[in-house]
């Protein structure tokens, strides 16, 4: 990997505090799991007043695990599962609901890359080479979500370059707090305009 340059227009991060879902219709809100609610909250904050189509990328190590565990219990106890519960247990259900809510018709990807889910999803979002909303959310080890509005016209200039020196990985919160983000594949750091 040489280097990729892009801009970050906005970052929204939450560990479960200040989840605002008031703009979501009640019927849709009821369909969201815990991880879906926190993801939807950060995506809505990042997306803001944008309108029209935008690429979407969602990443999660465990996805809708909470819902899957519930379905397994239902199957064990009643020998059947809720069709609605089943349909919302898929990995891309949250990003699908977001696209419905915001009337987005462009494609979206849902990434599960184990412990590298965040870095794989962010790389996928950057590789779109156009305005993209990226969201990572999980609820197993800790409840958290980060959404990033990637742009090529507006925002803070960022460079993604290969981690050829094999620097040790850190958490994306380092980048949020002004440092750089390091994962096994790449390094993400701010660049001069």
What role is predicted for each listed range?
Residues 1-193:
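Conserved "HGTGT" condensation-loop signature of ketosynthase/thiolase-family condensing enzymes
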């Amino acid at each position: 990997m040489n280097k990729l340059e892009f801009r970050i227009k906005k970052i929204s991060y939450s560990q479960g505090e200040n989840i605002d879902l008031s703009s979501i219709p009640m019927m849709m809100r009821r369909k969201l799991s815990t991880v879906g609610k926190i993801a939807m909250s950060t995506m809505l904050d990042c997306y803001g007043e944008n309108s029209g189509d935008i690429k979407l990328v969602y990443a999660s190590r465990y996805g809708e695990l909470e819902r899957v565990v519930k379905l397994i219990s239902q199957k064990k106890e009643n020998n059947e599962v809720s069709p609605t519960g089943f349909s919302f247990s898929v990995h891309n259900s949250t990003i699908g609901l977001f696209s419905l809510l915001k009337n987005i018709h462009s494609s979206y990807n849902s990434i599960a890359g184990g412990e590298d889910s965040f870095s794989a999803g962010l790389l996928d979002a950057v590789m779109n080479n156009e305005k993209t909303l990226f969201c990572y959310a999980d609820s197993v080890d800790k409840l958290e979500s980060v959404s990033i509005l990637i742009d090529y016209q507006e925002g803070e200039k960022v460079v993604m370059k290969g981690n050829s020196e094999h620097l040790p990985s850190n958490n994306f919160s380092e980048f949020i707090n002004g440092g750089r983000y390091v994962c096994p594949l790449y390094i993400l750091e701010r660049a001069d305009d």
